[in-house]
Amino acid sequence: MQHSFIEILRRALDEELARDPAVHLLGEDVAAGGAFGVTRGLAEKHGSARVRNTPISEAAITGMATGAALCGLKPVLEVMFIDFATLSMDCLVNQPAKYRYMSGGQLSMPLVVRTQAGAAGGAAAQHSQSLETWFIHVPGLIVVAPSTPAEAYGLLKSAIRFGEPVIFIEHKRLYTMKGELDDDAPLPMIGKARVAREGSDVTLIAYSAMVQTALEAALQLEDEGTSVEVIDLRTLLPIDMATIAASVSKTHRVLIAHEAVLNGGVGAELAARIGSELFDELDAPVLRVGCPFAPIPFAPELERALLPAHADLLRAVRELVGRASGPAWRRRFPRSAWSWKTSRSSAG
């Protein structure tokens, strides 16, 4: 049976409320269903003491949730749009992210922040941003960005049970996406990426809504004779470098795609790490696709023109496979001969 992203999130919250009396929901209009209807009916089922409306103050909501978590509850708060999670940053950065460290491991912080990100339907510059990189700069936070209904179900349940502060980012464009749910599937691990599609020529790394765009591009490129492996990061902090390394050692070419601006984005961090940790495996520079450094326009046609799309991924992959296999000096020798790691280990 097909379920929408919204229905799957509601089911996950419903089941966790039933499973653990410590789980509480709070946020603006949460008792009335929330801005997108994710929590609809949960207040009637579980009571207004556990599904609670709050004032329109992101800072206050986050502070209340932090206090509740310190007192033994497991709050799941909804910050309506990641654009306004900026108002929660003082508390998130200086309180939940720091308590375990500052207490020497004596305190945990089982707190989940659900928030909506990304451009969809002409919501304009103040309701369309992708600010996930703000959070991955903070030690002590976990950042999750699911790409399908089934992934959202499992990752949300894992986040609620994780025991650490989790920023759970839901792309608005995915809310109407439908998919099937395997009730017997194990819950995904926080910090573990998944190979969404296997391939051998190029590694295409994406997350959230961009995973679907990557899969569509990979399908078209297969008809052109290019095999693209698509990695769904799932968790942006921490990043699963082991899964990435296994793929890069097979394909030797990497493209990273996300909707956020390229400046200081997840792609920039990944490209730097791949370049330093997996340099010997690369036959071409790591390429990135993302938004230009500009606000998201209101006009739908301008919004579409700005956002990275299927065609952008096709161009980038074609550029990667069109390159010769590495710099000229590398092509004169087998891979084992130009590996500085091999040379260093044999010399030592």
Regions found by a protein language model. Give the residues of each.
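Short, contiguous clusters of charged residues that form electrostatic/catalytic patches at enzyme active sites
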Residues: E7-R11, G63, N94, A150, ...
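Non-catalytic, usually N-terminal nucleic-acid engagement modules in DNA/RNA processing proteins
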Residues: F168
